[in-house]
């Protein structure tokens, strides 16, 4: 299991990063809606950085509207397992801040952040991190399935 769901704006930076990963991925469209049917890790860009006083989660604007609409679907939100955010280090503390917001609001781990299209090191780190993440998730799921426990 290595499902990714991602959003990329017309800049295509996040799309390029996801392509480099070489993993199964579903793109949230710029126009229109989708629904997913399997657990996934969300990859998204961060918008609107560069505020003089640092991150302000009450201000909004960090998470793309398309991602908000996707996560406002209760079914989609129920399947998110983690988040990875893209950003720009020029924005200081707001670098990858969309990941912080989604992590807090959805109660999932913020797994990684990368700059713009990511580096080769980012690609390797995310690939390995996702392999480990899904292996741990499968192990946890195996240990907690009631049907298997009833047979013991």
Swiss-Prot record:
List the protein's name: Protein NrdI
Q: Which GO terms describe its molecular function?
A: FMN binding
Specify the superkingdom.
Bacteria
> Which HAMAP family does the protein's record reference?
NrdI
User: What PANTHER family does its record include?
Assistant: PROTEIN NRDI
The species is Mycolicibacterium vanbaalenii (strain DSM 7251 / JCM 13017 / BCRC 16820 / KCTC 9966 / NRRL B-24157 / PYR-1)
Instruction: Specify one Pfam family.
Output: Flavodoxin_NdrI
The record's similarity note reads: Belongs to the NrdI family.
Recorded name of the encoding gene: nrdI
| SUPFAM superfamilies for this protein | Flavoproteins
């Amino acid at each position: 299991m290595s499902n990714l769901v991602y959003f990329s704006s017309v800049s295509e930076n996040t799309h390029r990063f996801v392509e480099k990963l070489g993993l199964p991925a579903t793109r949230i469209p710029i126009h229109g809606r989708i629904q997913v049917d399997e657990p996934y890790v969300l990859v998204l860009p961060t918008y609107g950085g560069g505020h003089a006083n640092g991150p302000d989660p009450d201000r909004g604007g960090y998470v793309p509207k398309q991602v908000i609409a996707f996560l406002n679907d209760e079914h989609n939100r129920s399947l998110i397992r983690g988040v990875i955010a893209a950003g720009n280090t020029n924005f200081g503390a707001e670098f990858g801040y969309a990941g912080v917001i989604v992590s807090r609001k959805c109660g999932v781990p913020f797994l990684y952040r990368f700059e713009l299209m990511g580096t080769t090191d980012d690609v390797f780190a995310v690939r390995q991190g996702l392999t480990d993440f899904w292996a741990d998730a499968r192990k946890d799921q195996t240990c907690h399935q009631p049907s298997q426990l009833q047979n013991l």
